[in-house]
């Protein structure tokens, strides 16, 4: 007689490996790792059905520290490997771990194609605005004026905007979070619940080469005034609910308005399915505006692997083709057996 075996739910400890975590003391990657390990049991994940894929960089050591299947691949190519993994076994839960340099420099083309194809996976981009592994060169997201070994007089490049890039590439889920913030697990859970490519930019502090670059909105004294956590169906408020975002109708842009006595009638209500709102949120400049955080866009569409599976199934169920007819199909001609005189 067969006995039923009760499957014990996993715990964060089940997702930890015996590997020594080799990041600099105080690196924001530690907080992200713990957040992911805490999140996995809450989403009902199982280590044997989960795959972490990374490229090259400090963040890309991530698969070594997750008790799952993993691929530490080559520079910028994590999306390509992840696509192969998902197509080989669509039932796997695939997570891509990358950084601003890995994803937006050498891997920019692969990132774009993964997002436009809408592969069902979670894409976590650790943005510290610097190359950490190669000792502090400026990255695609480094701000103008950033001094580094490769830009000793200050960078003259305009920085890439990861979330704007993702939306422009056709991503159907775009979110932002902070490495040490308590809301990071909830953002990760929302990304996992989305069916399709879920792009999450995580502001990650590099304590060695770019320390406190995000302090204007991450430091405790600045957080309330400069962070705006976006919740679907709720008004876009910040500064303790005393300010909000409204639409400047004349210029079709956003503007900041004061919220008096709790009156939010003029404030935009966040709608995660509204792509126009998402574009405005990721493009608004920090300083005059707060930093928009949380789920900015979430509008599912059919996934890449489901379309491939359906296409292959239809092809397999079709009539077997005649090879000779296929060879002779289209523009064909006979080659003269007799050589022509030159």
Predicted feature descriptions by range:
Residues 23-25, 96-98, 173-178:
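Short catalytic-loop micro-motif centered on adjacent basic/acidic residues
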Residues 1-9, 18, 208-342:
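Flexible, low-complexity linker and terminal segments
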Residues 5, 9, 13-74:
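Active-site diphosphate/adenylate-binding microenvironment
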Residues 106-121, 126, 130-271:
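Glycine-rich ThDP/TPP pyrophosphate-binding loop and its adjacent helix/strand module
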Residues 56-132, 185-186:
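Thiamine diphosphate
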